[in-house]
Curated annotation (Swiss-Prot):
It is found in: Secreted. It comes from Phasmahyla jandaia (Jandaia leaf frog). The modification Valine amide is found at residue 29. GO terms for biological process: defense response to bacterium. This is Dermaseptin-J5.
């Protein structure tokens, strides 16, 4: 349903944010 889609989108956003944060840290070193 709609709620599961929202939850999946949230998980994807968290994953993307985590990857971006890791990338920023790696690039700043």
């Amino acid at each position: 349903g709609l709620w599961s889609k929202i939850k999946e989108a949230g998980k994807a956003a968290v994953k993307a944010a985590g990857k971006a944060a890791l990338g920023a840290v790696a690039n700043s070193v």
